[in-house]
Amino acid sequence: MTLLAWCVAWILDVVIGDPPHWPHPVRWIGRLINISQCVVRRVCHSERALRIGGGVMWLVVTGLTWAVAWGVLALARGIHPWLGWLVEVWMIFTVLAGRCLAQSARDVERPLRAGDLAESRSKLSWIVGRDTTQLQPQQINRAVVETVAENTVDGIIAPLFFLLLGGAPLAMAYKAVNTLDSMVGYKHEKYRAIGMVSARLDDVANFLPARLSWLLLSLAAVLCREDGARALRTGWRDRYQHSSPNCAWPEATVAGALGIRLGGPNDYFGQRVEKPWIGDAVRDIAVDDISRTIRLMWVASSLALALFIGVRYWLVGAA
């Protein structure tokens, strides 16, 4: 039943994604983070105090998320096994973000193909932290490919990994870790202290999934008739060409698979950030690379699901 729940939840994510008006735990987690952040900022004033307060905030948000998920699942199972199964499916479904990621990328791709740079930049600003107002088509393509590659880990592989380790409650806790990082894990002055713990522990949580993405995306490249050997080589060679210990693994692998170059300088919060280049410019990046990256993402996520189902079946059987 558990393995069936995994499959059903994954299929639901592929088919319907995250309908905008449905209740979603990430929105609730986001509200909890905002409340916690306000409390911490009201109580803590020095940089050291903000770091400690940020650590307490991380413990409260992730711990409460896990506890509520575990309690709701246990209660549902106590009422009826089938209700417990449905709740488990719903929880897993909400931590997966494949279709949402693909739709967001398509929302940027469509106006870009139509030559509407203003609309494409506007849609891109919803999914990246960089300044999009002056980006040219190649820069937009690069930003979308980087986002899809990186979030293949955050949105699919890592949630499935923690699902394997600790079931739906731990996958929900991972989502809280990831949401904390996306909301407060920045290096600029406003968040540097309060978000330090969230940023570093997100790096820890994604350490193994990011490295696993190197293998999964390389195999996906072979299955998608991209250059799997170059994906494997480039993913390994450029794995540390990023300020994050994890982001370059999927980005470099995708860059190698497609024969394009990612990274480079970008503007964040009004500041120019010089990033290393990732991959080799075998050819210029093009709008078609967005669709090709989405395809790599879906195949890699399918491989991740199959791998984790196989591992769980080997460890505990079909229960």
Protein language model regions, located:
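RNA/tRNA-interacting regions in translation and RNA-turnover enzymes
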Residues: 182
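Hydrophobic alpha-helical transmembrane segments
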Residues: 1-173, 177, 185-319
